[in-house]
Amino acid sequence: MVLQKLSLQRLAEDNSTPLLIIDHETIRENYRSFKDALPRVQAYYAVKANSDPEIVKTLYKIGASFDVASFPEFMIVYENIKNLPEKERQDFIWDKIIYANTIKQTKTLGELDPYKPLVTYDNIDELKKIKEHCPHAGVVLRIRVPNTGSMVELSSKFGALRREAF
């Protein structure tokens, strides 16, 4: 995106500062570059990183998947699919949206239940909570794996141990 100094000044005057300018073409290019580099990976965009509905819409239109951590984040994504035929909408929810908050509030699970979401869990207690408050959810067990050689140790933070998974 090329903006002249005068254009930036005018935008600041018209909209006040601070002012955030988002180039949706750059978002699309970055997404395509990522998919080209890792074609078999289905990455999920963390909506909490930037929940701007226009960014989510841009990513939706180019086939992105979404990681949501709250009901409002889910609804930002859902706005893009609410008018799809029912089966297509449900297929999108199961294939392209995952509720992966590590601490799942029972209220949020109840709000999500009618949408039959895909939900991660790390242990048997979480699975029981999901079953009670969001019985229509699909579930995905998050596995804790060693990350030997990583610069930042995160493997002890999330997921079930191998012995717990069986």
What are these regions (language model features)?
Residues M1-V119, I124-H136:
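A charged N-terminal "starter" segment
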Residues Y115-K116, D122-F166:
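Conserved anion-binding
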